Amino acid sequence: MAATDVDIFSNEEKRNLSLGGHVGFDSLPDQLVSKSVTQGFCFNILCVGETGIGKSTLMNTLFNTMFENEEASHYQNGVYLRPRTYDLQESNVHLKLTIVDTVGFGDQINKEESYKPIVDYIDTQFENYLQEELKVKRSLFNYHDTRIHICLYFISPTGHSLKSLDLVTMKKLDSKVNIIPIIAKADTISKSELHKFKIKIMSELVSNGVQIYQFPTDDEAVTEINSSMNAHLPFAVVGSVEEVKVGNKTVRARQYPWGVVQVENESHCDFVKLREMLIRVNMEDLREQTHARHYELYRRCKLEEMGFKDTDPDSQPFSLQETYEAKRKEFLGDLQKKEEEMRQMFVNKVKETEAELKEKERELHEKFEQLKRMHQEEKRKVEEKRRELEEEMNAFNRRKVAAETLSLSQPLKKDKDKKN
């Protein structure tokens, strides 16, 4: 079908037809539910906050279980992220939960780059998913999605204002992940201070342009509850897995000399609000927002870096095939250019090597001639010495013969004199 036919067909007025009998596609929601239950779900939580602020305790409280917790020291050289994955089941629903802890966050004297390991970790999970998506033979159905769906940002209950580290970190993260700020250990400040602290936090977030996750209000089923919960941000929470008896009931609470703070009592803290909003009402929206907003932004930026765009410089539609051909042509041009540069470089290198070899050959020849002349000079000197030595030997032999002749002639002369 031609493109024009598709355009004409898409612009036609849609008609509502009545069915003459039962067809069966009304079971599609049931099919989707059955498939989802069989496949299971994954949910990934990033907990950002200082050491000892109560991140692990809150996770245990949220999911009503005891996760593996390792005590973290306040003397870390830097920030590193520690992911832990657990398989949970509630009724017949399976959930693969990953909790990522930021170990050492806020413990260094120089906190200027404390956010970088967190940003790098989030980008790495996006990159892993993108690489799987770009494979020719991909398997997203079985792929363990590690993209962060929610960042719970734990704010210290100072009662005054946000720390610079908090503002910088949330600003760096707000375009990459859904952020829900929460005031940790909210039972350490009074209700009046807590109310003022919440207002101060939201004011500072707005003035610094930090975008936090807003519970969606476009779905009529959750519009009312989400609208009211947006007004309670940031949530002031208290975590505890200890059970305390209050009256005739046993509740999760924190026991103090002055009284008991009940975790699930909404007049004491916002824990129930956080749990409802995070898990019961908006968990799927957080997953969708991660994929449709944050991951798509990362994917678009990456593809644009690679040269893939939806429009050409004249803002005309540009298909993937055209982009591929343009990139292929550009790549081949660059390849030919580099081949020519390498060939020219090789030729120049060969010429330089030949010149160096010729120079070495000339130097060796000159050295050989010099050695040859030196050898001839030494040979001449040796020959001259030999001749001198032979002449001296001949002269010596002559003197020797003369001396022997003289010594023989002396006795004969004496005998002759005696006879006379």
UniProtKB/Swiss-Prot annotation:
UniProt-listed GO biological process terms: cytoskeleton-dependent cytokinesis; protein localization
Assigned GO CC terms: cell division site; microtubule cytoskeleton; septin complex; septin ring
Residue segments, region Disordered: 393-420
InterPro entries per record: G_SEPTIN_dom, P-loop_NTPase, Septin
Coiled coil location: 321-407
Family under the similarity heading: Belongs to the TRAFAC class TrmE-Era-EngA-EngB-Septin-like GTPase superfamily. Septin GTPase family.
Protein name: Septin-8-A
Originating organism: Danio rerio (Zebrafish)
Organism lineage string: Eukaryota, Metazoa, Chordata, Craniata, Vertebrata
Gene this chain is encoded by: sept8a
